[in-house]
Amino acid sequence: MEATADGPAETQSPVEKDSPVKTQSPAQDTSITSRNNADRGRVLALPEHKKKRHGNLPAKSVKILRDWMYKHRFRAYPSEEEKQMLSEKTNLSLLQVSNWFINARRRILPDMLQQCGNDPVIGHKMGKNAHATHLQSTDASVPASSGPSGPDNVQSLPLWPLPKGQMSGEKLPDPESAPSQKLTGKAQPEKKVKFSITSPFSPEPVSPEEYADFSSFQLLVDAAVQRAAELELEKKQDPNP
């Protein structure tokens, strides 16, 4: 009988102890789940908060930076001193100013140059064409000054004064047949001609005294004419040769 009485008591005690635990477990699970959801919401909201903090710069600061870039649009690379000055004006850090210029040179500067009519692509092409034209003109002027003399280059050469005999179409005498003229040519002193680099390339005026003396040649011509006249007169006087 004692064993049977103790048996039910022992079987009821675990039920009484376990029943309160089972009734409290759903509330604990709900609180844990709500805490986890709240933590997840904070984690998801954290990047948005950071994005708002590190978003666009103030409009006033951007206007100051844009004005500086437009003023220096042909050399939009501020020095360290200029970055420090812009940082003080815009209340931004040096890193923010540097990053803004890096992005602005790729996104804002090309449109700014096109609006001003200074397209960097067109300007680069025009510079190449002008350089090529200058090289062609330089190459074309070199043969005219230092190239060999040909039929095409004769017209560009300056006209030098010709001796009196060549201008009249007479043939110059042979140096061996006129020894007196040969001696006269040796006796003449050498003349130095000065050229000026700054003034146009033109010869100095030469006096008639500096030309070669053709008096001996004129004497030979007169003697030949006189001899021909004598022969003609002899033929007329002697009808029967």
Swiss-Prot record:
It comes from the Eukaryota. Belongs to the TALE/TGIF homeobox family. It is found in: Nucleus. GO terms for cellular component: nucleus. Keywords: DNA-binding, Homeobox, Nucleus, Transcription, Transcription regulation. One of its GO terms (molecular function) is DNA binding. The lineage of its organism: Eukaryota, Metazoa, Chordata, Craniata, Vertebrata. Coiled coil: none annotated. This is Homeobox protein TGIF2LX. Residues 21-36 have a biased composition (Polar residues). The keyword Phosphoprotein does not apply. It comes from Pongo pygmaeus (Bornean orangutan). May have a transcription role in testis. Residues 48-111 bind DNA. One of its GO terms (biological process) is regulation of DNA-templated transcription. PROSITE patterns: HOMEOBOX_2. Its main location: nucleus. Residues 140-151 have a biased composition (Low complexity).
